[in-house]
Swiss-Prot record:
Residues binding Zn(2+): 67, 70, 93, 96
GO cellular component term of the entry, any: ribonuclease P complex
Catalytic activity: Endonucleolytic cleavage of RNA, removing 5'-extranucleotides from tRNA precursor
Protein name (Swiss-Prot/TrEMBL): Ribonuclease P protein component 4
Cofactor entry: Zn(2+)
Length: 108
């Protein structure tokens, strides 16, 4: 029983470190995008691989900044197109053409 508790604690520590690294890589991608878009794509690719390895869910704001098709960093107007259709926001990657549809609700 004692060993399983230690393993769970160690697993949580590893996931926390991985989450911090993912957030750091996205910050670096945002800073680097204007001067070197290829490097920012690489940072997002690394963050995505870390997330898959340690089975971490990405927060919604970070999900909207990466393309699931080509692992590139998405900047509205530069590397992605954002359109509003009815009750959905459509984000289109301009590299691979993949679309993300995100529902939104208008306040009444």
């Amino acid at each position: 029983m004692y060993m399983s508790r230690m393993k769970k604690k160690q697993k949580n520590i590893i996931k926390d470190v991985a989450s911090e690294r993912i957030e750091r890589l996205f910050k670096l991608a945002a800073e680097e995008y204007s001067s070197n878009p290829g490097r920012s794509d690489r940072y997002v690719h690394l963050a995505r691989r870390i997330g898959m390895k340690y089975r971490i869910r990405f927060p919604s704001p970070l999900k909207r900044k990466m393309c699931r098709g080509c692992s590139s960093y998405l900047v509205p107007g530069s590397s992605s197109r954002v359109r509003l259709h009815g009750r959905y926001m459509t984000i289109t990657c301009l590299k691979c053409g993949r679309e993300m549809r995100i529902p939104y609700h208008l306040k009444e």
